[in-house]
Amino acid sequence: MQDRGSFRDPGNRVFAAPDAVYRGLSAEAADEWRALAASALADDPRIVATEEVAHAPEPWAALLRHERIPFVSYPYEWPFTLLKRAALLQLDLLLDALDEGLILKDATPYNVQWDGARGVFIDVGSFERYRDGTAWEGYRQFCQLQLYPLLLAAWKDVPFQPWLRGSLDGIAPAELRNLLSFRDRFRRGATTHVFLHARLERRYADRTREVKAELKRAGFRKELVVANARKLRGLVAGLEWRGASVAWGDYTQTWSYDENDAARKAGFVRDAVERVAPRLVWDLGCNDGTYSKLAAARGAYVVATDADHHVVDRLAREENERILPLVVDLADPPPPLGWRGAERKDLAARGTPDLTLALALVHHLAITRNLPLPELLDWLAGLDSALVVEFVDPADEMAQRLLAAKRAGLHADYDRSVFERLLGERFGVERTEELAAGRRVLYLVRPR
C-alpha cells in the first residue's frame, strides 16, 4: 500500500507492508541509488538498512526494501534536543556525501526518524550524484524546517512545535526576520542565514532557474557547498535551549509519593509489563520517564509523551535506546496534516500500543482541561490495548489544588465511583491497588 505522504517525487515512491517498507524507483532514481550503494555510505548505520529486491514489479526499474522504524514521529512532536540531533545528522551526511561525489537534494527533518535515541536517515532517494556548478538545493528547506525552529527556541525561548505543525514548509526567512530584534542581528549566523536570506529570497523569488544558470556560469564550486555546510554545522552545534519549565516540570519534586507508595506504584507497573509482555508501550504524561524506563528495561519500546517540553527534552538527553520522547498535548494532539489530511498521520494511525500507561494523568485532563471522563475513557479504550491507569481522588492534595481553580460544582462527576463505573463499562479490570490511604488508585485493565 502506497504511503499517502509519498507522492511529491514521481520517480521515488514508498509502500508500506507488514514486514517492511518498500521503495519503487524510476530508471533515473535507480542509477542514483546504485551510486550511493557503491559508495562508502552504503552500510552506514546512520542510514536506514536497505537492500535491493531482485525483481522489481512494473513500472519500477528497481525496488528497495527498508528496515522498519519502531514508531514514526514528526518534527513538530520532537523536543529541541531531537531536532538539533536531526539537523546535525543531515549536515554530517551531506558533508560525507560530498566526499563521495554525492549530495543530498533535500533537507527536510521528515527524512529522519528515531530508533530510541538513534537518528536514522530514511530517504535514500534524497542522495544523488553531485554535478559541478550546482549549489545545495536543500539549503532553504534546511533553514525553514531545522535551523529557524532551533533559532526560535534558542534565541527567543519560543516553542517551535506549533510553527512546524502550522506549516509543513516551516518558517519562512521573512517570518523569522520579523521576529528578531535589532540586537539579534549581531548573533552568529543571523546576518547570513536570516536577514540576507530574506532579502535575496524577495529579490530572486521568481528567478530560480536563472540563478541556477548564473551560478553554473560563474564556476560555482563544491568547496563552497562544503564551507557553507561546515559553518551551518558549527552554528547548530552551538545552539542551546534553556527554556523555563512549565508548571509540572518538577513534578517528582513537587508531588513526590512517600517511599513506600513510590515503590508500590513502581511494582504495580513492573508487574503489568510482565503480565502483558508488550512490544510497544505508550507512556502518556510520562514526565521524567520513570515508568517509561521500567518498561524499556523489560524489553518494550516506549513512546513517552508529555505536554511539558522541558521534561521531554530532559528525557531525550538521557539517550535511552528504547525510549522515544515526544512533546504531545493529549488535549490538543497532532492531527492528520498535509495534502488531503494524509501526508502526516495522527498518533493512533501510526501504530497502536500493546500497553498504555496513564499515570497521574486523568485528573489533569478531566479537571484542568475540562475533558469529559466518558470521552477520555472512550479514547483510551479506542487504543485497544491493555491499560494501567491511575485515579486521583478529589480529596487528594493534587486534585484539590486543581479543583480550587475551578468553579464550584463544575466537576461534580469527578468521583471514584463514577470513574470505576465508566472504566468497567469499557474494560475488564484485572487488578487494582490503593495508594496514599485510598486517595490514589491504580488499575490494570484490558479492553472488552
Roles of regions detected by a PLM:
Residues 103, 108-154:
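Catalytic activation segment of kinase domains across protein kinase-like and atypical kinase folds
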Residues 277-287:
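Conserved class I S-adenosyl-L-methionine
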Residues 288-300:
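Conserved SAM-binding loop of SAM-dependent methyltransferases across substrates and taxa
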Residues 301-306:
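Conserved SAM-binding motif I beta-strand of class I
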Residues 316-350:
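S-adenosyl-L-methionine
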Residues 357:
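A conserved beta-strand element that flanks and buttresses the S-adenosyl-L-methionine
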Residues 364-380:
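A short, conserved alpha-helix within the catalytic core of class I
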Residues 379-394:
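Conserved beta-strand signature within the Rossmann-like core of class I S-adenosyl-L-methionine
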